[in-house]
Every structure is written in C-alpha cells, then in structure tokens.
Design a protein with these regions (language model features):
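Repeat-solenoid scaffold signature
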Residues: 110-124
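Extracellular beta-strand-rich solenoid/capping regions of secreted or surface-exposed proteins
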Residues: 44-56, 70-78, 105-109, 228-233
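All-beta strand scaffolds that present successive hydrophobic residues in beta-strands
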Residues: 57-63, 80-86, 114-118, 233
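Acidic/polar low-complexity surface segments
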Residues: 1-46, 85-108, 127-157, 162-232
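Phosphate-binding glycine-rich loops and their immediate beta-loop-alpha structural context
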Residues: 50, 63-65
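Glycine-centered loop/turn positions within well-structured domains
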Residues: 71, 81, 128
Length: 233
C-alpha cells in the first residue's frame, strides 16, 4: 500500500471458499480495502541475484536484475566496485511482478576503497536502493593490554572473515556511539569458537598498540573495521 509500512497478513485460518476467492479471518487491517493489491512474500532471503566476496576492482556494466530471492547485489569484503548501467528493475509496464527483490537492491558489507553506482535504475525493491555498512564486533572479554575476545552480535552477521592482520580499527562506545581512544591495528586475529573462520561468531584479536584502559567488556564497546572511503551514487 502506497506510503505505508509493511502490512501484517497472518495466514492462519485462510481457506479457499471458491476459485480465486479466499476467506482470511485475521486480515483486519483497515488499509486492506477492496481493490488493494497485496504482494505476499516471506522474509527469508536464501540467495542474492549476484554475490561478490573478496573481489578487487570489479565492474558490472549493462546488467539488469529483474527478480531475486534476496538482495539484487550483495558484496562483502571487496575493494573498488563500479556499477555502470546496473539496474534492479521490473521488465517494463507489462511485468506481472510487483516487486523486484526481497530486500535491498544493492548491499555492501565491510567493503573498502570506492563504490561507484551510475546510470542505473533501482525500483520495486523491498528495502534500500543502496546500503553500505561495516560490521561491529562487541568486546566480550579483555585478556590483556593488547588482546580481546570479540563477538558478532547480529544474527545475520557472522560466518565470514571480519578482518586480517594489518587492518585498521576504531573502538566505539555502544551506548553513545562515541569514538574511544585512537585507531589501532590488528596484529593477529583468530577464530575463537570454531577451528575455521567459516561459522565463527567469536574472534581472539591481538592489537599492535596497547588498548586504552577504559576499553573493557563492562560498558559495551564495539569495534568497526575501517571500510569504504568513497561512495558515489
């Protein structure tokens, strides 16, 4: 429905009473008026249209994604991405679909360098046109002046490499989002709850410089790997 949030349409008790006619006893939202087109979908996102990981200097040109069971383009841990005439769009006025992707048209996680999107069209997606973000780890334990145990906290953000030796990071106080201390560099990072990075939620991280005394697990500190320096929509 135009200019509204998602409508909740419970499927419990829905019965077909005649061909193409259904009784939905729990559809009681006042915005569901006769003539309203309802696009039913799940919130699962099993696969993006295009997936990039650990790539460098990638260029996607004259590409159209008309539908995907997730993001249109999902990129993680990449450096320098150019989208020229890259579109997430319907096939035209006669396209029978009402939406293109289950979530964002394009989504960039923990990328670095320059992200350039030009001459494209993003329409019909169920969330953002362009979403660019890093990924925080929360400090769970301070082992010494150089080493911490840190953990992915969001259920959709784990199982991929958070950082590598030499990466620059910044500490952030979670309650206020204020920067704390200066930047530091990763000397060593190892999965702590798994034998491999795949599936790991916790890391043991040793830093090159001593940590500020106030950085502990008591108040809730996170750290963000330094990501994309330039974004051009």
């Amino acid at each position: 429905v135009y200019r509204t949030s998602d409508l909740w349409c419970p499927m419990e008790g829905v019965k077909e009473v005649s061909p193409r006619v259904y009784h939905a006893p729990q559809w009681k939202d006042a915005r569901l008026k006769p003539g309203t087109v309802v696009a039913l979908r799940t919130y699962y996102r099993p696969a993006p249209g295009i997936f990039l990981s650990n790539d460098k200097d990638t260029r996607l040109q004259n590409v159209k994604v008309h539908y995907a069971e997730g993001m249109g383009l999902l990129a993680q841990l990449c450096e320098n991405i150019t989208l020229d005439e890259f579109s997430v769009c319907l096939r035209g006025d006669k396209d029978p679909r009402y939406f293109t992707t289950q979530a964002d048209a394009t989504h960039f996680s923990s990328c670095r360098g320059k992200i350039d999107s030009r001459n494209g069209l993003y329409e019909g997606m169920m969330d953002d046109a362009i979403n660019v973000h890093g990924t925080y780890l929360k400090i769970k334990q301070r082992l010494d002046d150089h080493t911490v145990i840190a953990r992915y906290m969001h259920p959709q953000a784990y199982g991929f490499e958070w950082g590598v030796n030499g990466d620059e990071v910044q500490f952030v106080r979670s309650a206020t989002m204020e920067l704390t201390g200066g930047k530091n560099r990763v000397k060593e990072i190892l999965p702590n709850d798994k034998d491999t990075v795949k599936g790991a939620k916790e890391y043991r991280i040793t830093f090159a410089e001593p940590l500020d005394a106030e950085i502990t697990d008591k108040e809730g500190f996170g750290k963000n790997r330094q990501g994309a320096e330039h974004l051009r929509p």
